[in-house]
């Protein structure tokens, strides 16, 4: 960990978005309609949308299709770099998630399949 924090959560989210866009095996998993993901931590609040039509940062959201992930910068970093899974961090109470269970499972799958190769086990 540690070294990633220099980049900040925003930079890690940008890298995650780029991975989603370049990993073509993820396309069948992506929803037809946009699903919005909000990351909230002490210093940052970033929202982006994922769908088959693309993945990008957003300013406005459809609250019914929003999944909010809250936690410390370190916990969000651990999720975005693939060191721990979303549900593992929820059990450890490092992250909390608000939104539909279906969207949470979808995002858990995308995080797992899009994690950087150095963390693939």
Where are these regions (language model features)?
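Feature captures hydrophobic
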Residues: 2-121
